[in-house]
């Protein structure tokens, strides 16, 4: 008797070499008995956000991130006032990616239509865009006209290497190429630039020039250095949507090397983003880069003491990653003011919180679609663990993809998805409309191609050895901090009095997080995972030449074809190279819909 074996596999990459570098999520609320680490006020102080992706309404299933945008605005306003009273300067910065990842931004068209208005109620001093502001023409138009050219931010929005295309085809700078200003208290003369990484998937209303090309080939940069000589500038701020640590492209380091040619002795402070991690890099004795996480989990704080009487030639940098919760905000405000009863809310903050809540209800984001009986993790559980989200998808979700009516039922199939289509952990509790936007916001179309089993069985391995498959999902883990020699500088924390949370290692050591947490191990995420259905008791019993279906997301088509043709050639099979003409529409529900249907049973 021929039996159908549903054998759903995930790539085992990273199961052996787990690393406690960047844990993804906190699980429990921090104990009030756990002492937090203070922020240190300098001559110039920075508050930094990045990669918020629409998370303006707090993390409803995670108490460690229970502050909403109104709480954050109130915190910044009060903190700014307290620092200014100490005769020190404050600069508030955001480095882009404000949509794609939460219902508050994504349940409207275009994404960010309503959330941008709330986001912009923060009084940023400097801001720019990320790649998620450029995936569609509608998003680019909204960002350019609603934020970049708004009366509030027109003189504060900087984007040195992106151009916007007007309705008549005219190319104009997306924001200021650079700006100069003087800080109000310390009277520091500041030059600010901003760069987006070499992003090649912009829509037809925007053009991105690679940063190094922009610097070396455009006349504005040379004009800038000629009119802003080193002796006239006290501080350079380079903020943008590119990683602090990037062992492959090293764009930040290359930008720094070029700017250093013109400003060899000036303090240069960088602010990065894109790879969704907490990070701090020292570029030289007068330059560092801060990257402040993602998804309104982190408030980055940095101070520079530029007038140290002992050694004026060596500025003192101090960084802190603040957990995005109300208790942490209250702690830092009370310590700064030496007052445990310091107010932590403002009229403006309460208004913003109400707007966030009203928008959540208007978009029906709390609509319950099912129940999640346990928590599933993206990368802090091994891929073969029943607590891993990809394990759930490949074992419980993808097998429910119903083939079309004309599909041959005896045909074996391999269903592949790119891991970047999953954006976040799935937490125990109600499965709501918002949950869909948070975990798997994108719909997909299924395509398939017919190939011999011997080829299909090698596609997953081939893709997981190749470059990252482009998507709107989590950026490549290849940008995560590299630890040479295979050892960590920081200990793995396992304290029964602590909750799980971020335990960050950076160039300044192991104590940058304001809230001590237990570490979580981080497992590498492969490019793709697959569900394999082979119509034999054992796969090895199947005829390797038997034709099977490889099913995949439509945007993966070129990657699949490249893999299939390379495998065919490597095996020396007598087959013509396959093309898009050999791929067909498969049909069936999207993974997003399959996920919803699965949890609707609970």
UniProtKB/Swiss-Prot annotation:
GO cellular component: cytosol; extracellular region; fungal-type vacuole
Residues carrying covalently attached carbohydrate according to the record: 305, 497, 577
Modification after translation, per record: N-glycosylated.
InterPro entries, A to Z: 5'-Nucleotdase_C_sf, 5_nucleotidase/apyrase, Metallo-depent_PP-like, Nucleosidase_C, Pesterase_C1039, YHR202W_N
Regions annotated as coiled coil: none
Gene Ontology terms for molecular function: 5'-nucleotidase activity
Main localisation: other
Superkingdom, taxonomy of origin: Eukaryota
Keyword terms, alphabetized: Glycoprotein, Vacuole
Pfam families, per the entry: NadN_nucleosid_C
PANTHER family: 5'-NUCLEOTIDASE-RELATED (PTHR11575), ADL392WP (PTHR11575:SF22)
Protein's recorded name: Uncharacterized protein YHR202W
Organism: Saccharomyces cerevisiae (strain ATCC 204508 / S288c)
């Amino acid at each position: 008797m021929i039996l159908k074996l549903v054998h759903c596999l995930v790539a085992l990459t990273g199961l052996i070499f787990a690393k406690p570098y960047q844990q993804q999520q906190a699980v429990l609320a921090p104990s009030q008995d756990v002492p937090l680490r203070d922020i240190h006020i300098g001559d110039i102080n920075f508050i930094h956000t990045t990669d918020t992706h629409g998370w303006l309404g707090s993390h409803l299933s995670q108490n460690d991130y229970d502050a909403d945008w109104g709480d954050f605005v109130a915190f910044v306003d009060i903190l700014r006032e307290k620092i200014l009273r100490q005769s020190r300067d404050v600069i508030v910065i955001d480095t882009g990616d404000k949509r794609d990842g939460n219902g508050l931004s994504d349940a409207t068209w275009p994404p960010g239509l309503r959330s941008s208005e709330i986001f912009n109620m923060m009084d940023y001093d400097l801001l720019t865009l990320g790649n998620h502001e450029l995936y569609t023409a509608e998003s680019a138009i909204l960002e350019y006209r609603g934020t970049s050219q708004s009366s509030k931010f027109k003189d504060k929005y900087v984007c040195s290497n992106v151009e916007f295309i007007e309705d008549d085809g005219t190319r104009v700078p997306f924001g200021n190429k650079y700006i100069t200003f003087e800080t109000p208290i310390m009277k520091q003369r500041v030059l600010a630039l901003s760069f987006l990484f070499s992003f090649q998937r912009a829509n037809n209303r925007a053009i991105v020039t690679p940063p190094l090309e922009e610097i070396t080939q455009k006349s504005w940069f040379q004009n800038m250095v000629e009119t802003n000589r080193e002796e006239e500038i006290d501080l350079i701020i380079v903020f943008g949507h590119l990683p602090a640590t990037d062992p492959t492209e090293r764009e930040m380091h290359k930008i720094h090397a070029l700017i250093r040619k013109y400003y060899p002795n000036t303090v240069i402070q960088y602010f990065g983003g894109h790879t969704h991690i907490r990070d701090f890099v020292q570029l030289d004795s007068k330059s560092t880069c801060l990257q402040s996480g993602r998804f309104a989990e982190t408030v980055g704080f940095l101070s520079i003491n530029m007038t140290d009487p002992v050694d004026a030639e060596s500025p003192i940098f101090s960084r802190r990653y603040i957990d995005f919760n109300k208790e942490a905000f209250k702690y830092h405000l009370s310590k700064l003011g030496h007052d445990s009863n310091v107010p932590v809310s403002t009229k403006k903050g309460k208004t913003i919180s109400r707007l966030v809540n009203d928008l959540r209800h208007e978009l029906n984001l709390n609509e319950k679609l099912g129940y999640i009986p346990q928590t599933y993790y993206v990368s802090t559980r091994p891929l073969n663990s029943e607590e891993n989200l990809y394990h759930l998808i490949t074992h419980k979700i993808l097998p429910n993809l119903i083939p079309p009516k004309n599909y041959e039922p005896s045909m074996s199939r391999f269903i592949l998805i790119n891991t970047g289509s999953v954006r976040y952990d799935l937490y125990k509790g109600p499965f709501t409309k918002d949950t869909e936007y948070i975990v798997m916001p994108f719909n997909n179309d299924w395509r398939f191609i017919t190939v011999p089993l011997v080829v299909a069985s090698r596609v997953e391995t081939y893709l997981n050895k190749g470059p990252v498959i482009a998507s709107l999902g989590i950026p490549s883990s290849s940008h995560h901090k590299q630890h040479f020699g295979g050892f960590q500088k920081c200990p793995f924390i396992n304290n029964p009095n602590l909750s799980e949370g971020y335990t960050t290692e950076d160039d300044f050591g192991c104590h940058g997080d304001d809230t001590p947490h237990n570490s979580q191990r981080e497992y590498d995420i492969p490019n793709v995972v697959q569900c394999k259905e082979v119509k034999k008791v054992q796969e090895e019993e199947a005829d390797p030449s038997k034709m099977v279906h490889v099913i995949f997301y439509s945007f993966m088509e070129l990657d699949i074809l490249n893999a299939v043709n390379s495998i065919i050639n490597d095996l020396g099979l007598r087959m013509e190279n396959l093309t898009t003409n050999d791929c067909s529409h498969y049909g069936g529900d999207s993974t997003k819909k399959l996920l919803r249907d699965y949890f609707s049973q609970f």
